[in-house]
Amino acid sequence: MIRLDRVNKSFGHLRVLRDVSLNIEKGEVVCIIGPSGAGKSTLLRCINHLEGIDSGTIYLEDEPVYRYERNGKVVVDSERRIEALRSEVSMVFQSFNLFPHLTVLENVMLAPVHVRHEPKEEVRRRAVALLAKVGLSDKIDAYPQELSGGQQQRVAIARSLAMQPKALLFDEVTSALDPELIGEVLRVMRQLAAEGMTMVVVTHEMGFARDVADRVLFMADGVVVEEGPPKQIFTAPRHERTRQFLQTVLERNAEAGVPKDTA
């Protein structure tokens, strides 16, 4: 469904993605783990076309969105086509990005009404159903500042689902939350995975990656170092860099008394 072929991305002299190739099948849950600065979030932003690429090709359902030609130029699809593709691959951010002056319901309805020009009543019915799905039926008239961080993140997930995307990208969506609020967000994500939603998840929640992912990718220094089924990555990683990372994470969690996620 989503395919990257030798994608490269730099910010100035810093190479953030180095010849990254990746194939994500429909209905697959792929979790991306790795240290800070590995290029994980940039990879998601390139898939969602929030960042351009320097070379390589990105495909959505076998249609190239960015492609690199022999003359050294990256050819980008039309902006209109990019917007259409962006609505098919929605992204949920670490910082929620809700509009503070709009109610929860208005935040969820905004893009389908104003970007896709869908009938308002139809969108309203869908938004109400989605807020029920994420456990927020009683908050539809609330404003973001009246919600906890976990509730705001669930609104952000409902907002992404309102565009009826073919895939969802999650960029460390629990990292800004208090520990006791993480579980409520992970429960929603587990439900989406069980329903067959295609998901690419950048996460530090190792329990979620181990239990929910079909495949885990370990990234470091802009490269996919290793990928495989969760059991193989977490119990028998092939690369020393992967082993070092997992050992560090597990030791840090043990010192902090962080329990395995129970979502």
Language model region names:
Residues 203-204:
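H-loop/switch region of ABC-family ATPase nucleotide-binding domains
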Residues 227-228:
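ABC ATPase "signature
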